Each structure stands twice: as structure tokens, then as C-alpha cells.
């Protein structure tokens, strides 16, 4: 069993997006996805969800009438997704090799998750290249990353581990997480994403933060009334593209045109 499988067997992805901070992420991401989806003839619009987890996005989009294909590496997650019987075509697979999916098949491709776990730039570029291969020319790709500063602040400083992690080489002198091969996550800064796009010759349409400060405000979100919480989601949608806030959340989504 891989480290990724061990992690997702223990930490249920199904539950994460049902928390209030997870609901912020989902609501904002879905708003941006819908900006590029048709309102008619939805059954003709093909969406690939690579790293689909237990199907939070796949199932929601399939229920709206879109033609959704989901690919998931973790067997436990895939079994949950398949059990939902929501007309989602499900495949076991790895974002680095989507050879079972034909070229230029999908109108949009969602890549939420795989890039979190790929430590080297060449592997990230391979995943992006595969996503581009299966996406039609002019189609959209939604690529999500984990952000460096969230980990530095919420883990390294908040848990008082920053000094030992710098000493061990896990954090650089300029406070960038340095992932070891056996670690689960990789964290990036905006300039890292820009460099990947330049290396891959990838065109960005826009970039946005799906969660903003939500992960830093879990207790506060949980104490909000339903009305106030809805207003917080409105706030994040309104501010998701603000340049001065992009790198401060825990996730970021790069919308690319193939």
C-alpha cells in the first residue's frame, strides 16, 4: 500500500469537503468551474475528473447532466465513488499515465489532488501534459496546488517546529518547504506555478483561491450562523482573484486553456 493510499484510508476525503472550510473550497471552485460550462446540451459536454477522490465534484457535475469520467488512484476512494451510482464513468488510474483515455476527448479536465502529491517538477509537468493530451483544443484545465505559506504558518510555526525543520533541511532558509521523497505533500508558491506553466508552454486564463483564509479560520467558521457563513462564501467568491491574497490560502487553482 502506498503512502497516498494509507493517508486517504485514514483521513476520509469524503468528510473533508463536508466541513465548513471544505464547503467554502467546494462552493468557490464550483462557481469558477461553472463559468466555463454550457447551460444547454450538458450531456454533450465531457468532463474528466483526474484524482476524483470519492467524487465530490464528479457526482455533483454528473447530477447536473454533464458527461463525467472520473479517475482515482486510491482503491478505497474509488469504491466509495462507484457505490454512489451517479452515472459517472469510473477508472482506477494515475495522473501520470492516462493512456486508457483517448487524445482530445474532454471539453474540460479537473486536476484537483494529483499535483499535491507529485514532488518533482518533471512529474508535475507529466501530469499536466497528460491532462492536456486528453483535453480538446481550446478546452479548459483546472489545476489545483497546495500553497507553501499555509504549511509554514499552520504547521511549522504554529506547532513550534520551524527551527528543527530548517536544521533538518525540510525547510529552506527562505522558508520554502523542501519535500522528501517519502512525504505525502508538495507545497508551492505562485512563482513555482508560473515556472511550470512557462516550462510546459501552458496558457493561463486566470488563477484563483478557492478557500482564502478558510483553513486558518476553522473555529470561527464553525461558530458562524448559517446566514453569516453564506456571507463568508460570498466574500471568498468576491475576493478569490485578488492578487495580494492569492498565496495566503491553503489551495490555489490555475485555470488553463489547452
Regions found by a protein language model. Give the residues of each.
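Short alpha-helix
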Residues: 184-201, 207
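Conserved class I S-adenosyl-L-methionine
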Residues: 1-41, 56, 142-169
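A short glycine-rich, Lys/Arg-flanked "PGG" loop and its adjoining helix->strand segment in the class I
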Residues: 125-137
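Class I SAM-dependent methyltransferase SAM/SAH-binding core
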Residues: 55-97
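A short acidic, Gly/Pro-enriched loop at the edge of an enzyme's catalytic core
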Residues: 99-109
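A C-terminal cap/extension of S-adenosyl-L-methionine-dependent methyltransferases
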Residues: 206-258
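A short SAM/SAH-binding and catalytic strip from SAM-dependent methyltransferases
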Residues: 108-122
Amino acid at each position: 500500500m502506498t503512502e497516498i493510499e494509507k493517508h486517504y484510508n485514514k483521513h476520509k476525503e469524503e468528510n473533508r469537503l463536508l466541513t465548513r472550510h471544505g464547503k467554502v473550497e467546494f462552493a468557490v471552485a464550483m462557481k469558477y468551474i461553472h463559468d466555463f460550462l454550457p447551460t444547454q446540451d450538458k450531456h454533450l459536454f465531457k468532463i474528466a475528473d483526474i484524482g476524483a477522490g470519492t467524487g465530490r465534484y464528479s457526482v455533483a457535475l454528473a447530477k447536473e447532466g454533464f458527461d463525467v469520467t472520473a479517475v482515482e488512484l486510491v482503491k478505497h476512494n474509488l469504491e466509495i465513488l462507484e457505490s454512489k451510482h451517479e452515472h459517472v464513468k469510473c477508472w482506477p488510474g494515475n495522473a501520470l499515465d492516462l493512456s486508457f483515455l483517448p487524445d482530445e476527448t474532454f471539453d474540460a479536465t479537473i486536476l484537483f489532488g494529483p499535483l499535491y502529491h507529485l514532488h518533482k517538477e518533471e512529474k508535475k509537468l507529466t501530469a499536466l501534459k497528460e491532462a492536456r493530451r486528453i483535453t480538446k483544443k481550446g478546452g479548459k484545465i483546472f489545476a489545483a496546488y497546495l500553497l507553501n505559506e499555509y504549511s509554514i504558518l499552520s504547521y511549522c510555526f504554529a506547532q513550534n517546529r520551524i527551527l528543527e525543520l530548517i536544521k533538518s533541511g525540510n525547510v529552506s532558509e527562505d522558508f520554502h518547504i523542501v519535500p522528501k521523497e517519502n512525504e505525502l505533500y508538495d507545497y508551492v508558491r505562485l512563482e513555482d506555478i508560473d515556472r511550470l506553466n512557462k516550462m510546459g508552454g501552458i496558457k493561463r486564463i486566470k488563477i484563483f483561491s478557492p478557500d482564502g483564509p478558510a483553513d486558518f479560520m476553522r473555529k470561527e467558521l464553525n461558530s458562524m450562523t448559517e446566514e453569516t457563513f453564506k456571507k463568508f462564501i460570498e466574500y471568498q467568491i468576491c475576493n478569490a482573484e485578488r492578487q495580494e491574497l492569492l498565496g495566503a490560502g491553503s489551495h490555489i487553482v490555475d485555470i488553463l486553456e489547452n
